[in-house]
Amino acid sequence: MAYPFQLGLQDATSPIMEELLHFHDHTLMIVFLISSLVLYIISLMLTTKLTHTSTMDAQEVETVWTILPAIILILIALPSLRILYMMDEINNPSLTVKTMGHQWYWSYEYTDYEDLNFDSYMIPTQELKPGELRLLEVDNRVVLPMEMTVRMLISSEDVLHSWAVPSLGLKTDAIPGRLNQTTLMAMRPGLYYGQCSEICGSNHSFMPIVLEMVPLSYFETWSALMV
């Protein structure tokens, strides 16, 4: 969950988000080292009077600044590709949920159950209870079992939307006429908030997403009551 004046990413709740946080720190360290080197060279150029106006050729320097960037790019690309394949791979999901984007709400269908589907609208500000979050609460939360692989099928009924939950490392476009999929797994129970992350019209800001991750026994009880 985000909080005011937060500078970093949200706390990771899924294995994918943990990997993304590690990759973020890895890449940021490389950027920091490169920036420090460039600033150091600039400071030397500004503070020294030594120049090399007669230098016409420097094979060693050219070799270094060709090979070194290539190595740096490889060090960034390899972990990035690993995470991309992890995000794309879905093996034997325990549950499948289909979500459709609408202007301006989400609808959900649990495809493993016959009649388990509902719409999820934002709760207006004037109807919020004490402690509830403005522009983030919904009338029907998406209840899912924790520590289990869940496949999300995502599409749209009208315009482009994007289904995103930052603490789980999820952001998948909802495209009319196309069915995209992603996978999620929460390692601990709780409420996880997200929003539509694709500008989709005048009420784009009023399409929150709330996932309620619960133990499997609670989920089975909830699903039996909903069907």
Curated annotation (Swiss-Prot):
Q: Tell me its EC number(s), please.
A: 7.1.1.9
Where would you find this protein in the cell? Mitochondrion inner membrane
> What InterPro entries does its record include?
CcO_II, CcO_II-like_C, CcO_II_C, Copper_CuA, Cupredoxin, Cyt_c_oxidase_su2, Cyt_c_oxidase_su2_TM_dom, Cyt_c_oxidase_su2_TM_sf
Q: Name one GO biological process term.
A: ATP synthesis coupled electron transport
Carries keyword Transmembrane? yes
Chain residues that bind Cu cation A1: 161, 196, 200, 207
**What catalytic reaction does the record list?**
4 Fe(II)-[cytochrome c] + O2 + 8 H(+)(in) = 4 Fe(III)-[cytochrome c] + 2 H2O + 4 H(+)(out)
Enzyme type, top EC level: translocase
- Cofactors per UniProt? Cu cation
> What stretches pass through the bilayer?
15-45, 60-87
Question: Which positions bind Mg(2+)?
Answer: 198
UniProt-recorded Gene Ontology molecular function terms = copper ion binding; cytochrome-c oxidase activity
Q: Which residues bind Cu cation A2?
A: 196, 198, 200, 204
Residue(s) carrying Phosphotyrosine: 218
Q: Looking at the record's lineage, which domain of life comes first?
A: Eukaryota
Assembly, per entry: Component of the cytochrome c oxidase (complex IV, CIV), a multisubunit enzyme composed of 14 subunits. The complex is composed of a catalytic core of 3 subunits MT-CO1, MT-CO2 and MT-CO3, encoded in the mitochondrial DNA, and 11 supernumerary subunits COX4I, COX5A, COX5B, COX6A, COX6B, COX6C, COX7A, COX7B, COX7C, COX8 and NDUFA4, which are encoded in the nuclear genome.
What name does this protein carry? Cytochrome c oxidase subunit 2
Source organism (scientific name): Urocyon cinereoargenteus
Gene of this entry:
MT-CO2
